[in-house]
Amino acid sequence: MAGVNEIRSTFLDYYRKNGHEVVPSSPLVPRNDPTLMFTNAGMVQFKNVFTGLEHRSYNRATTSQKCVRAGGKHNDLDNVGYTARHHTFFEMLGNFSFGDYFKEDAISFAWNLITKEFGLPKDKLLVTVYHTDDDAANYWKKIAGLSDDRIIRIATSDNFWAMGDTGPCGPCSEIFFDHGDHIWGGPPGSADEDGDRFIEIWNLVFMQFEQITPEQRIDLPRPSIDTGMGLERVAAVLQGVHDNYDIDLFKALIRASEEATGVKAEGEFRASHRVIADHLRASSFLIADGVLPSNEGRGYVLRRIMRRAMRHAQLLGAKEPLMWRLLPALIREMGQAYPELIRADALISETLKLEETRFRKTLDRGLGLLSDATESLVEGDRLDGETAFKLYDTYGFPLDLTQDALRQRGIAVDTDGFSAAMQRQKAEARANWAGSGEAATETIWFGIKDKVGATEFLGYETEVAEGVITALVRDGAEVQSAAEGDVVSVVVNQTPFYGESGGQQGDTGTISGEGFAIAIKDTQKKGEGVFVHIGEVTKGTAKTGDAVELKVDSVRRTRIRSNHSATHLLHEALRETLGSHVAQKGSLVAPDRLRFDFSHPKPISAEELTQVENLANEIILQNAPVSTRLMAVDDAIAEGAMALFGEKYGDEVRVVSMGTAKHGSKEGKAYSVELCGGTHVRQTGDIGLVRIVSEGAVAAGVRRMEALTGEAARLYLEEQDERVKAIAGALKTTPSEALERVNALLDERKKLERELADARKKLALGGGSADGGSAVEAVNGVNFLGKIVTGVSPRDLKPLADEGKKQVGSGVVLFIGIGEDSKASAVAAVTEDLVGRFSAVDLVRAASVALGGAGGGGRPDMAQAGGPDGDKADAAIAAVKALII
């Protein structure tokens, strides 16, 4: 029986042997496609290749693409765990031709793979074609020998694929496997096609047309192929099971869940184990690709998935966070194929554990509210939207979690009411969020790239260079010239200007030629390797084809280099101090400062922050060379280079190494090794020093550090030194003794505060005074001490009441404190022998009402309350005395 890993390898090896480039899976967060929340098909990373905007070095490719469908229109979340084939995360095997082979070869490749390599019986296979696609039907007859009754013509859009309203499109041909007549269902196109007997395992898309308008469709000059085979589906077929959750991969994950919970995946618990297994995959891969749980966008979809799994863990009786304990099983099954799981192990584990720990605090309370709200509901009823929204807003229950919790009882949720409540609160969950907020792909730069090629970057070695203007863009359109006063984007054949990326800001400077000059205010990377210099023509007229001299602002670049190199050192110092789970989540490398966002679940202590700074400065003081090497990405990572989770790297990467580790597991090796395309100092000593100026949380599990280097750090320390001198002067001491002087003053203040409190206590207990009230008196035979005091804080009233109880021996005590704002605090106390007759809670509530308050609380022997009307203190004492009967 072939396992999932073997099936994946067989597929990729087969197409590699047939001339296809094996391309790694792209991240789950799509690059350069703001229309998608997550990568949901193998063709996503090739979209610009299919449309002609991008060109690759190969025209045949094959992939095993990780996919997520759990947001927007591609949302399988509700069904996951309850059906045989729904998943949030899945792998799509595919082969692609970019204008190379077409229908005949695509069908031949597919048929040979499934019947010869995979060994599926031919009599169990049938196909569909688009009803007008005679070519595909004839090829199936010729290559596979299929009869007409096993080539089903479908006239619906199910067998015609389109990228959008316009653009490439074409007919599809789907391959189905027949599980046998013991399972209900009919062939595709029949009335019973929704049954489970005939299962689609592969879809071949023949891109042969371009849709110009709804009425006009023309032939593509270079027809292409896009195919997709669900790995989990074909694994079920090859392993002789009818349910995806019975394949070896899921059996291993479910077995781990059973062992961790002590509950078998049977009966009512079967769906819960399946939900956990599926959602563990989706959550782990999303975190590995840089998504963290949050309340919006992709992060909110991740949170929905995680919390749905956590609710099912609770159904299985898990008393402690479960998901993170299952991660080793997932890594065993999928880590070899997807090494990002191994690299992100610590981050995934910490994120899963932290999110489940947080959610468990409200899960039980929320489920209790849900139980109370649905107690009178029966199958077919609906839970009102207001309650569903309260569960979301107060207890963190995503709507689909509430729906899932009510599913087995047959109770629906008023989703319109939920949406209305959401609108009123202005807290949209963005379930239909359409993208990451990135600007849409600017096609003009792809056109320029095709025409003039990519820009050669010279900035690692020089800050001055000569070049030729290859393109000018003004107001979104390509122009041939730009005159004085024009704001223009300039493309040059080669440049020393760094284009903004990886958090490092783009360079500024000047581009000049014969009779003209352009002040460059920013440099960006566009399309595929086009450096765009954005600036204003300050003199003359610049034209395409002009020779130019390019000068980077070297002072600004030097400061940026220093801050970028310091960012690397701080990153490694954070990992050494806090743990290997620390990973970069964002950065800003500017000339005046650096900002670094990183994953860490809790606040950082002052001692830890000092250690991070000291470790970075140790490497700076080494004045060690900063080396760069070009390496294959896998080799670089194997040597320990840090890669950003979710970042897409080319075949060759730039590896930046700094310093020598003096302790720990890396002792004697390079201290910091990262994949980085930015600019850096030559020696670590060029940084001067680094000073951390702030650190704090910016999101759940993400913290932000800001720091200064070099001259900026020196000026900051100088400013701090001047402040210390000014403070010392005000204290009439020296800077070295300022702290000692401050501590002495604080001790003196505490001493005086204690003496003042003692004096006030004595005054309050000393009988008649300007504070009002009286000494101990008898009220209906009960000793009563009622006092009105000022200058005593509410927290000091209870100690006064304790002293008052000693003074009366047996009786009732009431102290009312009047604050500077005329508000009153009251404490009532009853000696132990009278607790059976009087309750301090009842007494203090009577006082509170008289003071304009709303009651109080405490114990029968001591209770506290307050009120806004301090001038009614005498009435409050009278109200308490009236209760002593």
UniProtKB/Swiss-Prot annotation:
GO CC terms: cytosol
InterPro entries hit by this protein: aa-tRNA-synth_II/BPL/LPL, Ala-tRNA-lgiase_IIc, Ala-tRNA-ligase_IIc_anticod-bd, Ala-tRNA-synth_IIc_core, Ala-tRNA-synth_IIc_N, Ala-tRNA_ligase, Ala_tRNA_ligase_euk/bac, DHHA1_dom
Catalytic reaction(s) noted: tRNA(Ala) + L-alanine + ATP = L-alanyl-tRNA(Ala) + AMP + diphosphate
UniProt keyword annotations, A-Z: Aminoacyl-tRNA synthetase, ATP-binding, Cytoplasm, Ligase, Metal-binding, Nucleotide-binding, Protein biosynthesis, RNA-binding, tRNA-binding, Zinc
Record-listed Zn(2+) binding positions: 564, 568, 676, 680
EC number: 6.1.1.7
Gene3D superfamilies with a match to the protein in the record: 2.40.30.130, 3.10.310.40, 3.30.54.20, 6.10.250.550, Bira Bifunctional Protein, Domain 2 (3.30.930.10), Threonyl-trna Synthetase, Chain A, domain 2 (3.30.980.10)
Subcellular localization: Cytoplasm
SMART domains: tRNA_SAD (SM00863)
Free-text cofactor note: Binds 1 zinc ion per subunit.
Family recorded in the similarity comment: Belongs to the class-II aminoacyl-tRNA synthetase family.
PANTHER family documented for this protein: ALANINE--TRNA LIGASE, CYTOPLASMIC, ALANYL-TRNA SYNTHETASE
Full protein name: Alanine--tRNA ligase
